[in-house]
């Protein structure tokens, strides 16, 4: 997992710097005193077989470099809200994705939709930080955490009102997510070894989701056929970033909230 290892190494340095500046107990107290979040998990539940859209506000990626040169996160977020998205995802990783906490804060203030903080969370301080910056949900990546950390971080997030999207790549990680109590699980179609993508990854794992767990397909969804594939496999939602930026076909689909 070459890409993930490099990202986590950089993230550990960032977290250590954050810890030197801000005690975790102080962050926890502030996060616990904030008003209720907008329900991320609730927004992904629907009837009638429609698949929900989590639209990602994304400037760049390690595999593609800069995707949007004239990047205006609020303009993009408002366009996605008008498109019919049920929730938004905002990249906050600076080093690899050119994101920022400021982007999430701006977006959360501008829209009525729940907002997911998309980053590599490896420490409890980041969970409290996410709540303070305005996130309604966070991403936890099974491949980046020990099983005990995954369990504990899910519990911590719930205690301060955050929903959690738990990301998996295979059956083993899916089992760990379920055992840890995940209620929303995303299958990442991207291979973390080489960053190649295959939407069929989601379809192959869907039969192993227990009833009641919200299923999300992530990454590499670029055509209406890709959406149909995961919809027909029984997914509740899709998370799309780059695809919405480059594909008019995806933007023209009829999303439930439009």
UniProtKB/Swiss-Prot annotation:
UniProt-listed GO biological process terms: L-tryptophan biosynthetic process
Keywords tagged on the record: Amino-acid biosynthesis, Aromatic amino acid biosynthesis, Decarboxylase, Lyase, Tryptophan biosynthesis
EC code(s) of this entry: 4.1.1.48
Annotated metabolic or biological route of this protein: Amino-acid biosynthesis; L-tryptophan biosynthesis; L-tryptophan from chorismate: step 4/5
InterPro entries in the record: Aldolase_TIM, Indole-3-glycerol_P_synth, Indole-3-glycerol_P_synth_dom, Indole-3-GlycerolPSynthase_CS, RibuloseP-bd_barrel
Pfam families: IGPS
Molecular function terms from GO: indole-3-glycerol-phosphate synthase activity; phosphoribosylanthranilate isomerase activity
Organism domain of life: Bacteria
Catalysed reactions listed for this entry: 1-(2-carboxyphenylamino)-1-deoxy-D-ribulose 5-phosphate + H(+) = (1S,2R)-1-C-(indol-3-yl)glycerol 3-phosphate + CO2 + H2O
Gene3D superfamilies: Aldolase class I (3.20.20.70)
Family the UniProt entry places it in: Belongs to the TrpC family.
Protein's name in the database: Indole-3-glycerol phosphate synthase
Organism: Chlorobium phaeovibrioides (strain DSM 265 / 1930) (Prosthecochloris vibrioformis (strain DSM 265))
